[in-house]
């Protein structure tokens, strides 16, 4: 798999606004936010997309969701709600080919799914 901008952010080769970091994840602010609060929850393990996740990655996916929950509580979005999105490959809207989850919050979001 080719290197992405996220790999460079993880290695601190390019700047980013970091909201949270652990041994296995980094959470950064999106540089083109689609909501008042828009972060990207990125595993440090190289995984191209959700399609390439294996059963061994189940704990990592849980950690991503738990990071979103902790951010929601820390920023006061836990009561009003927030959106978590993963795009998969080009037709699914993925533009950076490293697994990541978008967290959008801070306003009532339109275009929701039932």
Predicted regions mapped to residue ranges:
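HIT superfamily nucleotide-processing domains
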Residues: 1-114
């Amino acid at each position: 798999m080719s290197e992405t901008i996220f790999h460079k952010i993880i290695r601190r080769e390019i700047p980013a606004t970091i909201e949270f970091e652990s041994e296995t994840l980094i959470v950064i602010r999106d540089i083109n936010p689609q909501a008042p609060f828009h972060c990207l929850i990125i595993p440090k393990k190289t995984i191209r997309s959700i399609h390439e996740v294996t059963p061994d990655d189940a704990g990592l996916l849980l950690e991503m969701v738990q990071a979103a929950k902790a951010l929601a509580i820390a920023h006061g979005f836990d009561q009003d709600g927030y959106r978590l999105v993963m795009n998969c490959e080009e037709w699914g809207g993925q533009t950076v080919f490293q697994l990541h989850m978008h967290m959008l919050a801070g306003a009532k979001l339109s275009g929701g799914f039932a």
